[in-house]
Swiss-Prot record:
<dbReference type="GO" id="GO:0006122">
    <property type="term" value="P:mitochondrial electron transport, ubiquinol to cytochrome c"/>
</dbReference>
<dbReference type="GO" id="GO:0005654">
    <property type="term" value="C:nucleoplasm"/>
</dbReference>
<keyword id="KW-0999">Mitochondrion inner membrane</keyword>
<keyword id="KW-0472">Membrane</keyword>
<keyword id="KW-1133">Transmembrane helix</keyword>
<comment type="function">
    <text>Required for the assembly of the ubiquinol-cytochrome c reductase complex (mitochondrial respiratory chain complex III or cytochrome b-c1 complex), mediating cytochrome b recruitment and probably stabilization within the complex. Thereby, plays an important role in ATP production by mitochondria. Cardiolipin-binding protein, it may also control the cardiolipin composition of mitochondria membranes and their morphology.</text>
</comment>
<keyword id="KW-0496">Mitochondrion</keyword>
<feature type="topological domain" description="Mitochondrial matrix">
    <location>
        <begin position="1"/>
        <end position="7"/>
    </location>
</feature>
<protein>
    <recommendedName>
        <fullName>Ubiquinol-cytochrome-c reductase complex assembly factor 3</fullName>
    </recommendedName>
</protein>
<dbReference type="InterPro" id="IPR027896">
    <property type="entry name" value="UQCC3"/>
</dbReference>
<dbReference type="GO" id="GO:0042407">
    <property type="term" value="P:cristae formation"/>
</dbReference>
<dbReference type="GO" id="GO:0070300">
    <property type="term" value="F:phosphatidic acid binding"/>
</dbReference>
<feature type="topological domain" description="Mitochondrial intermembrane">
    <location>
        <begin position="29"/>
        <end position="95"/>
    </location>
</feature>
<keyword id="KW-0066">ATP synthesis</keyword>
<comment type="similarity">
    <text>Belongs to the UQCC3 family.</text>
</comment>
<comment type="subunit">
    <text>Associates with the ubiquinol-cytochrome c reductase complex (mitochondrial respiratory chain complex III(CIII) or cytochrome b-c1 complex). Interacts with UQCC1. Forms a complex, named COMC, composed of UQCC1, UQCC2; UQCC3 and UQCC4; mediates MT-CYB hemylation and association with the first nuclear-encoded complex III subunit UQCRQ.</text>
</comment>
<dbReference type="GO" id="GO:0006754">
    <property type="term" value="P:ATP biosynthetic process"/>
</dbReference>
Length: 95
């Protein structure tokens, strides 16, 4: 009988915890109007920021493609954002 009582108590506590969690989640979640306002404020909405992010992605992709095509360690270049040309130092570290 005590085991059944403990199981019912644990079930009730878990149910109450789930109910409180669901209620808190419903209170914290922004409404549709707030979601739209947040989307308008995102940095990707501004053309300059979008262009900058696209350029950065292009440079990163070009660097990764070059690194895949060569045996040189492009990570050791002083200016790895500029493309090609051997990097000036031979690709190695100097002591």
């Amino acid at each position: 009988m005590t085991t059944l009582r403990k199981l019912l108590l644990v079930g009730a506590l878990l149910g109450a915890g789930a109910g409180v969690g669901t209620a808190l989640f419903a209170l914290v979640t922004p409404g549709e109007e707030r979601k739209q306002a947040m989307l308008k404020e995102m940095p990707e909405q501004y053309p300059q920021r979008r262009d900058e992010a696209a350029r950065t992605k292009e440079l990163l992709l070009a660097t990764l493609q070059e690194a895949a095509a060569t045996q040189e360690n492009v990570a050791w270049r002083k200016n790895w954002m500029s493309g090609g040309g051997g990097g000036g130092g031979g690709g190695g570290r100097s002591a």
